[in-house]
Amino acid sequence: LLQVPLEKGQSAREYLQEQGLWEQYRLKYPYNPMAKFDPSFAVAGEPMTNDADLAYYG
């Protein structure tokens, strides 16, 4: 078992907001996590995480 330390960084949303590009990005790439999967494989009713808000890496 290996322990990997986590580091907190800026989320993609924070970075784009800082650059003033978040609204432009959000309009160009609307949040739709199921767009990349075949709908016949849908088995869950829970939405997937929004990767734009991830801030911990390790």
Swiss-Prot record:
Which Pfam family is one of this chain's hits? A1_Propeptide
The UniProt record lists the EC number as 3.4.23.-
Q: Does the keyword Protease apply?
A: yes
For the keyword Heme, the answer is no
Q: Which GO terms describe its molecular function?
A: aspartic-type endopeptidase activity
A single BP term in Gene Ontology: proteolysis
Keywords in alphabetical order: Aspartyl protease, Hydrolase, Protease, Zymogen
Maturation propeptide residues: 1-41
**Stored InterPro entries:** Aspartic_peptidase_N
- Family of the protein in this entry: Belongs to the peptidase A1 family.
Which protein are we looking at?
Answer: Pepsin-1
